[in-house]
Amino acid sequence: MKQILDFIPLIIFFALYKMYDIYVATGALIAATAIQIVVTYALYKKVEKMQLITFLMVAIFGGMTIFLHDDNFIKWKVTIVYAVFAIGLTVSHVMGKSAIKGMLGKEITLPESVWANINWAWVGFFTFCAGLNIYVAYQLPLDVWVNFKVFGLLAATLVFTVLTGGYIYKHLPKEQNGQSSDVPTDE
């Protein structure tokens, strides 16, 4: 349910962009993201930091897009959000606390080196996506950028999440990955 709730603002943005324009879509994105935060809190009594950061960026850059009637701001929002996530993961690692471990470490037991590898992989992913967004936003037409933002980045994130899950599974203790500790493995 929560994952579906996370995609609703993006779907609304895409639909209204196709029906109207970037400015109507951006206004709807701001409103839908605000409603998403309220609904998330009502259902789960908690809102994650990533959601709050995303909302703040949507409100600031979306507001500037509408107020100044300049779609460059909403294009930059994507890059800045990914950059903030990459910087946040880097800073948390340097300070000795893996943000990803903080999110998943209660359910999953992994060696510190594996958490560090996952952290750096996501830093690389977010950095790559931030740069790719700038390229697509300024080298290709607005329609292409909207499709890239909605479908390309979503697909890339889902694929990277699955790859991360595979990496995690590979490094789980035998008890957590469904294998009995007395069953021989091919290691």
Swiss-Prot record:
Topology versus the membrane: Multi-pass membrane protein
What HAMAP family does the entry give? Answer: YciB (MF_00189)
The secretion signal range is none
InterPro entries named among the record's database cross-references: YciB
- Cellular component terms (Gene Ontology): plasma membrane
Instruction: Supply the source organism for this entry.
Output: Vibrio vulnificus (strain CMCP6)
Which protein family is named in the record? Answer: Belongs to the YciB family.
Gene name on record?
Answer: yciB
- What is the stated purpose of this protein? Plays a role in cell envelope biogenesis, maintenance of cell envelope integrity and membrane homeostasis.
**Per its record, how is this protein called by name?**
Inner membrane-spanning protein YciB
- State one Pfam family annotation: IspA
Q: Is this entry keyworded Cell inner membrane?
A: yes
Q: What is the lineage of its organism?
A: Bacteria, Pseudomonadati, Pseudomonadota, Gammaproteobacteria, Vibrionales
**Record field: transmembrane:** 25-45, 50-70, 76-96, 118-138, 148-168
Q: Which UniProt keywords apply?
A: Cell inner membrane, Cell membrane, Membrane, Transmembrane, Transmembrane helix
Where is the protein situated, by its record's location annotation? Cell inner membrane
